[in-house]
């Protein structure tokens, strides 16, 4: 070590060390998340979450390793550490020695070794039949008509598939129009598009309650009618899960066009990632039409339907047929690394959105990666328009495999042959909570987000409100519920989906009994966590964007200041999407959690009955 520094960059012990080999120079490596056990003498024992390997290091070394959670080359880690820790400036050889020692100990994750483990495994391509397509609609017959026209043009209706229109319309006239659309479309295109509206739903609900009287309350909550002022997005999706049980299921929102739109720059690579989607911005509403894929117009063919249920090596063979290069791990969080195994299966497939991304907030525009945000702020006039107009390509440029299901698209594939949870039938963010619950039931399950999009063009013009990004995060019921479940996921030792589904019901019964004080504490904790996370991310983005135009930098600084100011104000005491005063909101939340728990207890029996009796 150089004598000018007191930084203790050395080891005390190495336990279970591997042979003395350095990582290949082209490899990408990252420090494994470790359990840390403080010792005396400024030392800490580490045990790797992924490898189970152990070592003892000085606390200074541990601090340095905490800077190595991103997958980078050895040289990139070295340069980053010298920049992040001034005491290490000029100590290239010492840094390399320590990182190589950590690699030999088994606590550095290797992209090359993982890629070898996940080598593609060729599999027979399945015919795109035996699928269940469910269109979900509510009081939008014009949108349904437009969607069906695009399906007639771009989709091959195979006799082995089943097709449903699940109608949640409240107005009788719209119900009649949708039923007529199904009948006329079926006649004209020689396909059985089944209308599944209030009458059909009521019929099946009655039969379910008669067959399963002990679960009557749970069935009514998940599948029954609610007051007209309630948003029941999840209710329609529960009917889709039941109709599609035992099949590959495709969920389609009514306000999309059934066609495939490619990104301007499309890759043929696959990646394992923890990152969010890319964004591309357009100056006019119809520019995307030049990106339509005329040769493969159906967004649900190829890997979208074919990858459902496949193991990761099989899905890689289907997507690209090539072994993952080290760069494919660049955006992977080490915490997710161990979830990508040969036995991991794709349970969810999705594609991006062209037009309206479907998000109520636009704060994520300031959290985009470098390439996307450069496109965002390239022109001031267009930048100002992008803050309000929902007209962008939002998706992937690669075949992106994820172990998180935080964003599910307007066209979603679900492997309903597996045990799945029901959606929460009320409120928004039903897909966010569903994704977290799928991950809870199947910890090694994957989502494949595909490198194309479908046009999402609501008939009504939607715009983001001015100043929306400056508003501090506030929880709705289901986003908060997803947060609470995420904290429990790693602590459940059960290995079977059935047992984990039972524990889900217990989890929501426990939430239903939470005290006011504890609920207020958790609301404050999650709000502060989101706010401070946004502040950190935006501050880092601002620091790494000195070349960005002043108008964007000023706006980003104003958002950071607004979020910092919100830290001095009282935390929310209720839920933004439940009416009433905060006490009423908390009481309502507890009642809804209790009702959902009864539904979770009923769900497995409902699914089994529907498969036998539909």
Roles of regions detected by a PLM:
Residues 176-247, 264:
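Active-site-proximal specificity loops/subdomain of glycosyltransferases
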Residues 27-30, 34-39, 107-120, 124-125, ...:
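Long, compositionally biased intrinsically disordered regions
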Residues 132-140, 154, 166-168:
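A conserved hydrophobic helix/loop-capping motif in glycosyltransferases and polysaccharide synthases
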Residues 2-7, 42, 50-127:
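Long, charge-rich, low-complexity alpha-helical segments
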Residues 272-406, 410:
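Extended catalytic-interface subdomain
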Residues 149-160, 184-185:
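Short, acidic, metal-binding catalytic loop of nucleotide-sugar glycosyltransferases
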Residues 1-67, 604:
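Acidic, low-complexity/disordered tracts enriched in E/D and polar residues
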Residues 438-454:
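Catalytic donor-sugar/metal-binding loop of nucleotide-sugar-dependent glycosyltransferases
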